[in-house]
């Protein structure tokens, strides 16, 4: 690709656990979304969450990602999940108290297949910041986005506390603009680079 010819690596940002209610997928398979029977599904960010407890959904997600990875020279994937799961029900889980556990096992299954099929692919996971920062996710992705707060001074505290349990190499960070969009703090570019690295 042109990116590789420039000496860089190419990455894509995915949010594969979501579905838009106006999408072809949802129109053809509304049962793929998590929803409580007899209730209108709860939207967040104009999205519904796909039911990873459902084997068909896991296969669909894997096949879609595989199609992209097979037709592009992708080195890096950022796997994001930006909304809360509000309709906690799946007809594929006999004990609804196990819903979240089964959902995450479904996610692990997809990530396992991807990492086995594409061992050189770098995956960074993210969930509205660091909501999935745990050893289970690190098994499949050696980097996790720690927080959506990218102000370097704020990040010092976030990254310090994460370092009590996790290696620094697992903490993903970006260099942000100054003044920072959330805190309006101005910091030198060198500080922003030092904290992000």
Q: What annotation goes with each model-predicted range?
A:
Residues 1-11, 17-24:
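Conserved structural scaffold segments of CAZyme catalytic domains across common CAZy folds
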Residues 50-80:
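An active-site-proximal structural segment forming one wall of the substrate-binding cleft
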Residues 10-14, 77-79, 124-125:
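Hydrophobic faces of well-ordered beta-strands that scaffold small-molecule active sites
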Residues 2-5, 63, 67, 106-113:
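Alpha-helical scaffolding segments of alpha/beta enzyme cores, especially the outer helices
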Residues 6-10, 73-75, 118-121:
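Short, well-ordered coil/turn segments that N-cap beta-strands
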């Amino acid at each position: 690709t042109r990116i590789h010819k420039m000496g860089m690596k190419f990455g894509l940002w995915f949010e594969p656990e979501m579905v838009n209610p106006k999408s072809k997928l949802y129109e053809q398979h509304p049962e793929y979304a998590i929803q409580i029977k007899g209730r209108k599904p709860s939207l967040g960010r104009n999205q519904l969450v796909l039911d990873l407890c459902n084997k068909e959904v896991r296969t669909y997600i894997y096949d879609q990602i595989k199609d992209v990875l097979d037709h592009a020279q992708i080195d890096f994937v950022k796997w994001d999940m930006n909304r809360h799961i509000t309709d906690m029900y799946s007809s594929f889980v006999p004990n609804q108290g196990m819903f979240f556990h089964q959902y995450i096992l479904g996610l692990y299954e997809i990530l396992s297949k991807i990492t086995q099929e594409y061992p050189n692919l770098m995956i960074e996971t993210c969930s509205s910041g660091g909501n999935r920062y745990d050893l289970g996710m690190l098994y499949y992705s050696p980097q996790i986005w720690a927080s959506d707060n990218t102000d370097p001074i704020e990040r010092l505290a976030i990254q310090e506390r994460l370092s009590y349990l996790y290696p620094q190499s697992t903490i993903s960070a970006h260099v942000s603009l100054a003044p920072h969009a959330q805190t309006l703090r101005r910091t030198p570019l060198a500080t922003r680079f030092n904290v992000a690295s």
